[in-house]
Amino acid sequence: MARSVLSALSELRETRLEKAQALKELGNGPYALRFESSHRTANLQADHADLAKGEERLLSVSVAGRVMARRVMGKLAFYTLADETGTIQLYLDKATIDAAASNELASGTFVQLTTLVDAGDWIGVTGVLRRTDRGELSVKVQQWQILSKSLQPLPDKWHGLADVEKRYRQRYLDLIVSPQSRETFRRRALMVSAIRRWLDDRAFLEIETPVLQAEAGGAEARPFITHHNTLDLPLYLRIATELHLKRLVVGGFERVYELGRIFRNEGMSTRHNPEFTSVEVYQAYADYIDMMVLTEQLISSVCTQICGSTRITYQGIEIDLTPPWRRASMHELVQEATGLDFMGFADRAVAASAMARAGLEVPSKADSVGRLLNEAFEQAVEVSLIQPTFVLDYPIEISPLARQHRSKPGLVERFELFIVGRETANAFSELIDPLDQRQRLEAQQARRQAGDLEAHGVDEDFLQALEVGMPPTGGLGIGIDRLVMLFTDSPSIRDVIAFPLLRPELKT
């Protein structure tokens, strides 16, 4: 930032500090305890839309909010007051305000209001309603009170925060000047409530599971590690809620879910944040086909509630979330996109050679035909799945917690839901055979010991729970942040997380 700009900001702050002191000496602030509002701005606008130009309605109203703009013209002034619901104009007439000030110790004069209150300040006012000759519904102010003095200027109201990084670092400024950002987080809150309500209405119970865990399991991801001092014990921030929710199914809860925060010590991008939100849902006596139906119904219902329709636009592309959605196996989609039939490859070497001839990368870490199939899918298919698509029947090597497919050897009963080229949900017919589960987790443990930091460990307590007996179960996980991105037409996950993790700011 240029030195002249810093100097100007410093001078402005000093001026506002002087105004705050002046208000304090007048007994009017500058930091109030409370204010009793009778209305919110949106209610006033809606309830008094019939007020004609030039008319007053002798109804006493009290509103509070932040001053967003101000115009002073001699003995008249016009302020724009914003609260969470909208804005309303304040009509300030010197004679009216001064008359009230002479009889009301809690209210200041017109001159005090117009010289000591700046854009950015929080104020509360009481007055009557008036429709100006230009048709603007206004509160004709009789009394006013400073509620909180702002010492920093607001961003330019016309240009907002042009610096995207600053919008994320100082979200409070972004929310002040951007109605779109406020609407994004309002929709997020409504969406989360709608998901919980949908599940609650269908007899699912939300039960909280530990964030701090002795063994990080339930996903292939690198965990954050911490330490419990009293127990002298290493602990992990959870990378999934899966294994504890399954324990609850073992314990007799037949429909259970948790919507909460997940932590993965991985990279950041427009699609990934190390701390994110998911909902995991488990239903006894169900399989992955049942979970597909549940996923369609849940997402389409919530979309209708939040967006008004199952047909929405994302980044200029029309998306139709009306069920039923397309269903296709991973093998079918890869063969359709590349011509490669992974079902016919005898071993990894043959599959790798075919991939190379098709122009696909062959990473060394993909050490089996199944892992190469997944690589081919990610490279050649994933981004093309714009309309909602259930991708079915994944390789067993990359799905250690999913049940083996009932009719396709080497595959599991698993689907992932893709919308606008992004994975949005993941579900299994859950693996309930404790012996099969132990073998797969031990194979994962071997991969971890060989250097794969994302591989699962062996959770002995979870395996013991499976030996007690778990009923057939369908499980589902939905990424809340990516769903919010879709429902708010947001290009980056940072746009829908109020305070995303960012790289340290470089100091100049």
Curated annotation (Swiss-Prot):
Subcellular localization, as worded in the UniProt entry: Cytoplasm
Protein origin, superkingdom: Bacteria
The keyword Ligase appears for this protein: yes
Cofactor note: Binds 3 Mg(2+) ions per subunit.
Keywords: Aminoacyl-tRNA synthetase, ATP-binding, Cytoplasm, Ligase, Magnesium, Metal-binding, Nucleotide-binding, Protein biosynthesis
GO biological process assignments: lysyl-tRNA aminoacylation
Keyword DNA-binding: no
Residues engaged in binding Mg(2+) 1: E416, E423
Classification via HAMAP family: Lys_tRNA_synth_class2
Subunit: Homodimer.
Name under which the protein is recorded: Lysine--tRNA ligase
Lineage, top ranks: Bacteria, Bacillati, Cyanobacteriota, Cyanophyceae, Synechococcales
Name of the gene this protein is made from: lysS
